Amino acid sequence: MNKYVLSIALLVASTGAFAQNRLVKKAQGLINNNQIEEAQTLLTEALNSGETKDMALAWDVQGDLYQRLFADELNKAAAHQPLDTAKFAKNLYACLDAYEKCNEYDEKKEYAEKNKGNLMKFRTFLMYVGQFDFQNQNFTGAYKAYDAWLTYPQNHKLVADEPKVLNDSVFDKNQVAYYACLAAYQGKDFDKVATHLEEALKYDKEAKTVRQLHLMTLLEK
């Protein structure tokens, strides 16, 4: 009798896991058809049910969905149309987090190559967020973006050892550190002015400004 009950329990559990995995596959199809809201509903259920077996796939698809959303905003900019900078930033951060979670579950490294390529490209977009937010005087958001760019190798394991990430040829790390210090000061988040101070002081063009920011921060705290 106990063996029979156990068999039924295992059957029910496996059926539930299979159903949740089907939700993820269905969500993939919906994303391809640009039915984003419907896809998100299915993914939310799959990610929170506790029954989904292939969590790496679920988080990979979730990352793809967020990528679709922030890419839509970039396409607007390319077409010289107004873009929602807050929506762009929100979905970029969410996409990065989703791919990182995928990597944590991806024991067989099925998605590593794909997501590594994405992460290599997406770092630049953090600079867009920083620029958008600074121009809109959202200094907290600007600091977050610059800090995320600077700490990218530490926070994204798939690209942590990539030479192009460790030594970015597009943006000067010391210049980005200066932007971070400036955003923190403008946002009156004085403790964060010192976070990237050492690197910012190496940006010779604005080293004097950085020292002044540091001094004013000490006086205003």
Predicted segments — roles?
Residues E51-K53, E107, Q154, K205:
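Short coil turns that delineate tetratricopeptide repeat
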Residues L65-A180, D191:
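Short coil/linker segments at helix-helix boundaries
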